[in-house]
Amino acid sequence: IRDCLLSRGLGDVYKRQDLDKTMTEEANKIVADLDGLADRRSIVLYNEDWHKGVIGIVASRLTEIYYRPAVVLTRTDDMATGSARSVSGFDVYKAIEYCRDLLENFGGHTYAAGLSMKVENVPAFIERFEEFVSQNILPEQTCAVIDINAEIDFRDITPKFFSDLKKFNPFGPDNAKPIFCTHNVYDY
């Protein structure tokens, strides 16, 4: 029984990973085809076929790739439901709160939120959300910041180094992956 449950659990993980990959690829294609993306300070995407359980992950990926607040919406029954993610220093909750008259429900915090609205309110939400973000985001908040933990010599990057680094797993919010930099490296 235990092996069967474990196998089923792994199947769910793989299914979620496939959904994540497929939806992220679809979202990136939509973003690439958007007119005027360079002039927008936010990304809001709606696709009624996307899986509700993965939209938060996709919103996070869009924020990482394009470094803008992102909202990803899908259809749940007769409502558009979604997840929002933000960039460092920008309060996405306030941006969503600014649109509250268009929403049925919302909640969250500075960097992540959930929301629901009538499907017919999605176009107005996209414009209102963009309005707030454009008026309130600072230029430096739209550029990715890479915090380097340490400089290391290239010759110190060895299999033993990676083996030692693995001992610090698991990485996550309270134990971030370290970021190192080295100099004078060329890609031929």
Tell where the protein language model's regions lie, with residue ranges.
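Hydrophobic helix-and-loop "lid/oligomerization" segment in the mid-to-C-terminal part
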Residues: R2-N121
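Mid-to-C-terminal polyanion-binding domains and interfaces
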Residues: D18-L45, Y98-Y188
